């Protein structure tokens, strides 16, 4: 079924300039709606780990982008105090008490998740924003004013602290989503964008900014890398001096690596304070 769905969406994408809310076949509409519904249920996801490597399903990103072309903006009520005007309704717009109970997650006012995002059991959404295509796995806390961008992949038992920004990606199609693997802690006001991967059991301190151009300096090895935080890393904000010594530029510093057992036993503050 998903192969047939993918073929319809890939073909529609090639002719997307001709599509509009008034000009699209029933087959295309149904395929796009089904893809969004599957993303919403978590039956499909934009990226998944296969044989130890992350694979991105670009056709699902195409489905999300096509959905914008196929829908008109419409007023959306906001609990009587305001209205929104958009193409994508709230994930919870038509939820009943039974739906919330079956979902097994908490949604604290005024948290927003758009339809097409997946929220797993035992997730807590504090007043935060989760965009279309995102996947938030079991036991994760999305704290106050945190943002989970479009198509971002958040693992199990992750803590996204207050004000954290997890970047979204829909265009360009070749760009990969941000991935935060299981059991990671992302400190307050940190930003992870541009398809950076934070591997499992890592701790990112408060105020760390990670993009594809951010130098990641491993204090133990002296190595500089980009775009990926290795599993079990403890990362803080830092600076690296210029070659001529006239200035320094921002970087992220891996101050140590810990295994899952140590991570479970030792408090976060102790990990971050240790030499």
From Swiss-Prot:
PROSITE patterns: HEXAPEP_TRANSFERASES. Keywords: Acyltransferase, Amino-acid biosynthesis, Cytoplasm, Diaminopimelate biosynthesis, Lysine biosynthesis, Repeat, Transferase. It catalyses: (S)-2,3,4,5-tetrahydrodipicolinate + succinyl-CoA + H2O = (S)-2-succinylamino-6-oxoheptanedioate + CoA. Its main location: cytoplasm. One of its GO terms (cellular component) is cytoplasm. Gene3D superfamilies: Hexapeptide repeat proteins, Tetrahydrodipicolinate-N-succinyltransferase, N-terminal domain. Its EC number is 2.3.1.117. Pathway: Amino-acid biosynthesis; L-lysine biosynthesis via DAP pathway; LL-2,6-diaminopimelate from (S)-tetrahydrodipicolinate (succinylase route): step 1/3. It comes from the Bacteria. GO terms for biological process: diaminopimelate biosynthetic process; lysine biosynthetic process via diaminopimelate. The keyword Flavoprotein does not apply. GO terms for molecular function: 2,3,4,5-tetrahydropyridine-2,6-dicarboxylate N-succinyltransferase activity; nucleotidyltransferase activity. InterPro entries: DapD_Trfase_Hexpep_rpt_fam, Hexapep, Hexapep_transf_CS, THP_succinylTrfase_dom1, THP_succinylTrfase_N_sf, Trimer_LpxA-like_sf. Disulfide bonds: none annotated. It holds the Pfam family THDPS_N_2. It is an enzyme of class 2 (transferase). Substrate binds at residues 106, 143. It is found in: Cytoplasm. Homotrimer. Belongs to the transferase hexapeptide repeat family. PANTHER family: 2,3,4,5-TETRAHYDROPYRIDINE-2,6-DICARBOXYLATE N-SUCCINYLTRANSFERASE, MOLYBDENUM COFACTOR GUANYLYLTRANSFERASE. This is 2,3,4,5-tetrahydropyridine-2,6-dicarboxylate N-succinyltransferase. It comes from Burkholderia mallei (strain ATCC 23344). The lineage of its organism: Bacteria, Pseudomonadati, Pseudomonadota, Betaproteobacteria, Burkholderiales.
